[in-house]
Structure formats: C-alpha cells, structure tokens
C-alpha cells in the first residue's frame, strides 16, 4: 500500500506547483502588457 501513501503527496505537490506557476505567469504577462501599453 505504499502507492496509496505516496500518491496524495505527489498530487498535492503537483497542484501546489501548478497553482503557483499559472497565476505567476499570468501576472507577469499582465504586468509586461501594461508596461508595453503605457509606452
């Protein structure tokens, strides 16, 4: 039953990485777009 114990950890880690990476990329894209529009 080691697979059942490591699976949730991998899922939580995957969700945490994507949950932080997606908004960060979107936020950086919005900032770069704002600065590009201001110029």
Swiss-Prot record:
Transmembrane stretches, start-end: 14-30
Pfam families: Cytochrom_B559 (PF00283)
Presence of the UniProt keyword Heme in the record: yes
Biological process according to GO: photosynthetic electron transport chain
Cofactor(s) required for function per UniProt: heme b
Subcellular location as annotated: Plastid, Chloroplast thylakoid membrane
Record-linked InterPro entries: PSII_cyt_b559_bsu, PSII_cyt_b559_CS, PSII_cyt_b559_N
Assembly and oligomerization: Heterodimer of an alpha subunit and a beta subunit. PSII is composed of 1 copy each of membrane proteins PsbA, PsbB, PsbC, PsbD, PsbE, PsbF, PsbH, PsbI, PsbJ, PsbK, PsbL, PsbM, PsbT, PsbX, PsbY, PsbZ, Psb30/Ycf12, at least 3 peripheral proteins of the oxygen-evolving complex and a large number of cofactors. It forms dimeric complexes.
Family note: Belongs to the PsbE/PsbF family.
NCBIfam families xref list: cyt_b559_beta
Identification of the protein by name: Cytochrome b559 subunit beta
Organism (species): Physcomitrium patens (Spreading-leaved earth moss)
The gene coding this protein: psbF
